[in-house]
């Protein structure tokens, strides 16, 4: 059985996170990913010091929001806790699952580790099933290169049916392409891709 909003648990969205938008038309972007993929480095690279930290409603789990802008859009980035799956088994995973499913984000960026990409694809595929506007950011391409691992970003994009961007988040300029794709998705210019559909046995 595939993931649906209803299958994630009744009442999961009872306590909503307050999103601090700089303007009414600012886009909300969830930053998701497995632990230790450089997700917070992407967050810090995009938002700099323009961020706010606190706790998720009813949780001791830390929450970080930050603002970044392009010439086309303003964004509120929400750095959600690292998780391997939307099937929650801890408070952190529950927070991540609930925000992806119920948080109303305009886009979800799933950050992946280029050195162990296969392990990251479970969360990517689950997120594609739930959300309409998903971007995959393959981070740590420099480390992958050192390990003689080559990631074919174009083929990955073709297979997944969603935009795929490569990055070395420690180098801020490499995040410009991610911002450009975020703008395109916000403007409805994501192309004519059809997101991958997972078939499950009866």
Q: What residues fall within each predicted segment?
A:
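Conserved G1/Walker A P-loop phosphate-binding module
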Residues: 2-88, 103, 107
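Conserved nucleotide-binding/hydrolysis micro-motifs of P-loop NTPases
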Residues: 49, 58, 82-83, 114-118, ...
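Conserved C-terminal guanine-recognition region of P-loop GTPase G domains, centered on the G4
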Residues: 66-72, 95-165
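Canonical P-loop GTPase G-domain recognition
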Residues: 142-196
């Amino acid at each position: 059985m595939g993931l649906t909003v209803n299958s994630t648990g009744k009442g999961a969205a009872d306590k909503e996170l307050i999103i601090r938008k700089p303007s009414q038309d600012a886009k909300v972007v969830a930053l998701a990913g497995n632990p230790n993929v450089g997700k917070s480095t992407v967050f810090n690279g995009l938002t700099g010091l323009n961020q706010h930290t606190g706790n998720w409603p009813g949780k001791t789990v830390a929450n970080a929001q930050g603002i970044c802008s392009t010439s086309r859009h303003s964004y509120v980035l929400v750095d959600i806790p690292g998780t391997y799956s939307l099937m929650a088994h801890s408070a952190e995973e529950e927070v991540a699952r609930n925000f992806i499913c119920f948080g109303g984000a305009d886009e979800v960026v799933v950050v992946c580790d280029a050195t162990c990409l296969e392990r990251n694809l479970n969360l990517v595929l689950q997120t594609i099933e739930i959300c309409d506007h998903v971007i995959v950011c393959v981070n740590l391409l420099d480390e992958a290169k050192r390990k003689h691992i080559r990631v074919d970003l174009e083929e990955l994009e073709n297979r997944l049916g969603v935009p795929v961007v490569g990055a070395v988040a420690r180098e801020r300029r490499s995040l410009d392409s991610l911002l450009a794709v975020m703008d395109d998705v916000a403007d409805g210019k994501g192309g004519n891709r059809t997101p991958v559909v997972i078939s499950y046995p009866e």
